[in-house]
Curated annotation (Swiss-Prot):
Extracellular-side positions: 40-264
Protein name: Signal peptidase I
One GO CC term on file: plasma membrane
Family: Belongs to the peptidase S26 family.
Keywords (A to Z) from UniProt: Cell membrane, Hydrolase, Membrane, Protease, Transmembrane, Transmembrane helix
Length: 264
């Protein structure tokens, strides 16, 4: 074997080692520190829109099987390690107890031991209603009009919620404006979507969410588009044709938007 071949082999090994190191670092960051998520639904509209790309922090609540595991069938341990208590008003990515194969993103409203009820769309926590003020309207990209409300939780966390606006004086949806009383069990939490009329949350089928099911705390939007580009069901030609309109659909105003800054 000549010297050129030896040097070539060393170069290949060095490049492979560098590549493997980068992959390992990326995996550690994804598993332990931060993970990006894409939001496919409008249950948090207009705080979070469809096709918003969310950056979330894994370390915010410590780690559980559902935050560390890449695959649903791998069960590393029970409970959480390095657990940190979530705060009321956090936007949380979690596994819903009724379908562990998917991820939900909602706003945390009720803590363990809380008594929660909605009366005429107003949230009552332990028999005290939160501050809620109508501040205007929001018209979605689909042309649907919403009433916009500013809500403040007992810990001072402020955010906006949205209700479908009346059409010719008729309220389109009033199904979940008044609820039964919910008593949040120990170790579990109560969630609502900011889009109150179009959210499958703790008022409906979701129920309470165990702390163990928390994956990460959503922090900011790092990218956003009006349409989806990648689709496993379409061919390469259609993907190429779809690339230009996808780029044109980028929502520049939403890039690097902090999810906890209330900008009126």
């Amino acid at each position: 074997m000549n010297r050129d071949n030896i040097n070539s082999n060393k170069t290949v090994k060095q490049e492979f080692g560098s590549f493997a190191f980068v992959i390992c670092i990326a995996l550690v960051i994804r598993i332990l520190i931060m993970e990006p998520f894409t939001v496919p639904t409008g249950s948090m509209k207009a705080t979070i829109l469809e096709n918003d790309y969310i950056f979330s922090t894994k370390y915010s609540y410590g780690y559980s099987n559902y935050s560390l595991s890449f695959f649903d069938f791998i069960h590393l341990f029970k409970g959480r390690v390095f657990a940190r208590e979530p705060e009321r008003g956090d936007i949380v990515v979690f596994r819903p107890p009724n379908d562990m194969s998917v991820r939900y993103i909602k706003r945390l409203i009720g803590l363990p031991g809380d008594k929660i009820q909605l009366i005429d769309d107003v949230i009552y926590i332990n028999d005290k209603k939160i501050e809620r003020t109508e501040v205007g309207t929001y018209i979605g990209e689909d042309g649907i009009k919403y009433l916009k409300f500013k809500e403040t939780l007992p810990n001072g966390r402020t955010y906006f919620s949205y209700k479908l606006a009346p059409i010719f004086g008729v309220i389109p949806s009033d199904r979940y404006s008044n609820t039964d009383v919910f008593y949040v069990p120990e170790g579990q939490y109560f969630f609502l979507g900011d889009n109150r009329d179009r959210s499958n949350d703790s008022r409906v089928n979701l129920g309470f969410v165990p702390f163990e099911n928390f994956i990460a705390k959503a922090q900011f939007i790092w990218f956003s588009t009006k349409i989806t580009w990648w689709d496993n069901d379409i061919g390469i030609i259609n993907l190429i044709l779809k690339l230009k309109p996808w780029i044109e659909s980028v929502r520049l105003s939403r890039i690097f938007k902090n999810l906890y800054n209330v900008d009126e």
